[in-house]
From Swiss-Prot:
Binds 1 [4Fe-4S] cluster per subunit. Its cofactor is [4Fe-4S] cluster. This is Anaerobic regulatory protein. It comes from Bacillus subtilis (strain 168). It holds the Pfam family Crp. One of its GO terms (molecular function) is DNA binding. Gene3D superfamilies: Jelly Rolls, Winged helix-like DNA-binding domain superfamily/Winged helix DNA-binding domain. The cysteine cluster which is probably involved in the coordination of the [4Fe-4S] cluster is located at the C-terminal part of the protein.
């Protein structure tokens, strides 16, 4: 996957004071493609601030399918949902998609620092709440509208995060295989193939010569999933 992001990173959504605190109490660690920073169910002792590379955040569904919830890159933070919880365990898995480096932040050390600064604690908890809303909205689309709803909402989120306006619609400026899209929907690749084929026949999307999707009728997708018009900070692919 080749991600050419235009969305804000987590460092754009938190203050410089909080970001500097995270950097000051961290240590560097290399990460290799196809390894995991953590897996769902493991004891949660660390948070990670990405310096380079790509990380996929997801989980296994009850029927054994991969469900991708986030794709994280430079300056994003992962593992944050375990803060201020007793006997914390990671709720999701973090798979390395591209070699890189992370800053490792000890959970207990961060909690001690935040307790001494109420303003930064409030900011961090507010930021965590935003991430929870993102995950909840993605799961909502899957539960209420099935695989089709998950695919349609994924295309909308991709257009918000990586979209480039054109005269004929919105170019989603990343290259994704149908298998990549299937993981965002916890669906089989064959199902995604059929759904994308239907959208092409209806003129909702097309594929350019480089394999990128052009979204011609985003309002059609919004109508189909009864879009709630969430703000862009919620309706994106991270």
């Amino acid at each position: 996957m080749n991600f050419l992001s235009v969305r804000p990173s987590d460092s754009d959504l938190i203050s410089s004071d909080l970001y500097e605190l995270l950097e000051s109490i961290s240590t560097k660690r290399k990460m290799e493609k196809h390894t995991y920073l953590f897996r769902e169910g493991m004891d949660a002792e660390e948070l990670y601030l990405i310096q380079s590379g790509l990380i996929e955040i997801g989980k296994l569904t009850s029927d054994g399918k991969d469900l991708t919830l986030r794709i994280c890159q430079k300056h994003d933070i992962v593992g944050e949902l375990t803060l201020f919880t007793e006997e914390p365990r990671y709720m999701l898995s973090a798979k390395v998609l591209e070699d890189g480096e992370v800053l490792v932040i000890n959970k207990n050390k961060l909690e001690k620092e935040l307790i001494q600064n109420g303003a930064l604690t409030f900011e961090f908890m507010k930021w965590m709440s935003t991430h929870l809303r993102k995950i909840q909205s993605k799961i909502r689309d899957l539960l209420l509208h099935g695989k089709k709803g998950a695919l349609y909402s994924t295309l909308i989120r991709l257009s918000n995060s990586y979209g480039v306006e054109r005269s004929d619609g919105i170019l989603i400026n990343i290259v994704l295989t149908n298998q990549d899209l299937a993981k965002f929907c916890a669906a089989a690749r064959e199902s995604v193939n059929r759904m994308l084929g239907d959208l092409r026949k209806k003129g909702v999307i097309s594929i350019d010569e480089s394999g990128k999707i052009i979204l011609h009728k985003r309002d059609y997708l919004r109508c189909e999933i009864e879009c709630e018009n969430c703000p862009l900070e919620i309706c994106n692919i991270d």
